[in-house]
């Protein structure tokens, strides 16, 4: 089943710094649509098509992500929207407010944004890339800072569907999600700002990943990196065994000093740690929109300073640097 989302993106970038992407990206997306679709993809697209057309009178992106008022839809339509959106569970990153419907996601991603946003350069009129964007919560907040265009990259097709479900209620032409990894993006030094939050520790080759992020930035552009870290000096890096906090796909957890050293070795400038925060069970928890296990189940029940495997509990750093 072909979808129109990407053709709209190609039109938007034709006269932009991203125009060189048109040499490769349409072919990659076409191959993806032919060969790599999730088994539920067509079902999900049909569900998206059932979302009712509404006319939100108010769009709020600066303080939260909210599309429309409860008073603009009737009770039947509200139940219809809830029923359809719940077909895309689990909802991990948010929260979203759609015509009075509170999508209470596993993560309070708004808390992370509050830790990040004060420390970054203005996004006004900037081309912004969010690598590992999930369902796009932070992309909407970036748009709320008046970015010229926000592009997200995340290979998860469920996240793509969640993004398209929210975009249904605010079809803004300045925001797009591509179902690809950063390694598939053409390296054209086109972005003013690149974000990558919650991805580095999932990569087997973290320095290669940092280099890929750098290759998306224009000279002088800003990188905002948020990742799990451990305490220690510049020689401290934790590699967990089979799992870390029940996650299988976790590789390197450096200290902040080690991470800054990696970035300096790769040629990043003005590298600095701007925030350090322990993840709490209030920030990541099970909800009606993500009703399976969450952080409290992944920590030592007798000592929340440790994971269930005995490693240091999640500690997240925000590092900012320029190309």
UniProtKB/Swiss-Prot annotation:
Homotetramer. GO terms for molecular function: methyltransferase activity; transferase activity, transferring alkyl or aryl (other than methyl) groups. Catalyzes carboxymethyl transfer from carboxy-S-adenosyl-L-methionine (Cx-SAM) to 5-hydroxyuridine (ho5U) to form 5-carboxymethoxyuridine (cmo5U) at position 34 in tRNAs. This is tRNA U34 carboxymethyltransferase. Pfam families: Methyltransf_9. It comes from Pseudoalteromonas atlantica (strain T6c / ATCC BAA-1087). Belongs to the class I-like SAM-binding methyltransferase superfamily. CmoB family. Its EC number is 2.5.1.-. HAMAP family: tRNA_carboxymethyltr_CmoB. It catalyses: carboxy-S-adenosyl-L-methionine + 5-hydroxyuridine(34) in tRNA = 5-carboxymethoxyuridine(34) in tRNA + S-adenosyl-L-homocysteine + H(+). The lineage of its organism: Bacteria, Pseudomonadati, Pseudomonadota, Gammaproteobacteria, Alteromonadales.
């Amino acid at each position: 089943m072909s979808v129109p989302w990407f053709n709209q993106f190609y039109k938007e970038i034709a006269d932009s710094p991203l125009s060189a992407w048109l040499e490769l990206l349409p072919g990659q997306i076409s191959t993806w649509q032919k060969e790599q679709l999730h088994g539920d993809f067509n079902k999900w697209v049909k569900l998206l098509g059932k979302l009712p057309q509404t006319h939100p009178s108010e769009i709020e992106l600066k303080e939260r992500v909210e599309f429309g008022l409860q008073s603009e839809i009737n009770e039947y339509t509200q139940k219809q929207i809830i029923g359809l959106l719940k077909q895309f569970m689990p909802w991990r990153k948010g929260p979203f407010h759609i015509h009075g419907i509170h999508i209470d996601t596993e993560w309070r991603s708004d808390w992370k944004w509050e830790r990040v946003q004060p420390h970054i350069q203005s996004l006004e009129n900037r081309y912004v890339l969010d690598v590992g964007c999930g369902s796009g919560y932070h992309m909407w907040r970036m748009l709320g800072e008046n970015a010229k265009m926000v592009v997200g990259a995340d290979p998860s097709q469920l996240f793509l569907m969640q993004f398209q479900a929210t975009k249904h209620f605010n079809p803004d032409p300045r925001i797009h999600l591509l179902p690809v990894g950063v390694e598939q993006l053409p390296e054209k030094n086109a972005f003013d700002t690149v974000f990558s939050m919650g991805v580095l520790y999932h990569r087997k080759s973290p320095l290669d990943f940092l280099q890929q992020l750098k290759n998306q930035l224009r000279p002088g552009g800003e990188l905002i990196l948020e990742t799990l870290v451990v305490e220690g000096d510049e020689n401290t890096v934790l590699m967990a065994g089979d799992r870390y906090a029940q996650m299988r796909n976790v590789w390197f957890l450096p200290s902040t000093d080690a991470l800054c050293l990696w970035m300096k070795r790769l040629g990043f400038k003005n590298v600095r740690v701007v925030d350090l925060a322990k993840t709490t069970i209030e920030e990541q928890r099970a909800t009606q929109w993500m009703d399976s296990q969450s952080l409290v189940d992944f920590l030592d029940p007798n000592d929340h300073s440790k994971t269930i495997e005995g490693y240091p509990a999640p500690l997240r750093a925000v590092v900012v640097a320029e190309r």
